[in-house]
Amino acid sequence: MMRTLITTHPLLLLLLLQQLLQPVQFQEVDTDFDSPDDDMEEFEEYLEEFHRTGPTRPPTKEKVERRVLIEPGMPLYDRNYCNEEIMRKNVYHKQRCVTEHYFLLMQYDELQKICYNRFVPCKNGVRKCNRSKGLVEGVYCNLTEAFEIPWCKYESFYRRGYVLITCTWQNEIQKLIPHTINDLVEPPEHRSFLNEDGVFVIPP
């Protein structure tokens, strides 16, 4: 049969062999993608912090804004608030879940001014904290399950109270800046609680 093909259709066979012997050509795939500079810088910073083995980097305005401060949107009393926001904002410490965290509904300038308020005892009673003069809305997140990402599970608590923070001096700008959120202390008349159905009840 092969001999018949060669003798009767030599041109067809030649074209077929030419196609088979042609080097395989791979189409170049452009793997580059457009990403805003801010998002890429944030992602690189997250990777650096994620794999860091030394001391935690000192706080910056951008880091506090990204991890602590929130904008109006998702209801603060949503019971899944912490699980969603902690994942979205990449709030972790060296590949492990943070045991607690605070989200505050306020602007950075307002938070920074608290650094110049009077001292009060921190909730652990060891250090001194600065306390806000007015009440601030926020969410307290308490770790309930797992210790390593991405299996962190949190219980969410809406709070409206006085913010306790620690501050640190930043030489570059010659100012005190927020370092950690120590607590969000509710006055007794403003404390939120769960009713019998497990729904958060927020007093006016």
UniProtKB/Swiss-Prot annotation:
One term under GO cellular component: extracellular region
Any GO molecular function: nucleic acid binding
SUPFAM superfamilies xref list: RNase A-like
Subcellular localization, as worded in the UniProt entry: Secreted
Keyword tags: Disulfide bond, Glycoprotein, Secreted, Signal
Record's keyword annotation contains RNA-binding: no
InterPro entries named among the record's database cross-references: RNaseA (IPR001427), RNaseA-like_dom_sf (IPR036816), RNaseA_domain (IPR023412)
Disulfide bonds: 97-152, 115-167, 122-129
Major subcellular site: secreted
Signal peptide, first to last residue: 1-26
Biological role: Does not exhibit any ribonuclease activity.
Family: Belongs to the pancreatic ribonuclease family.
Name of the protein described by the UniProt record: Inactive ribonuclease-like protein 9
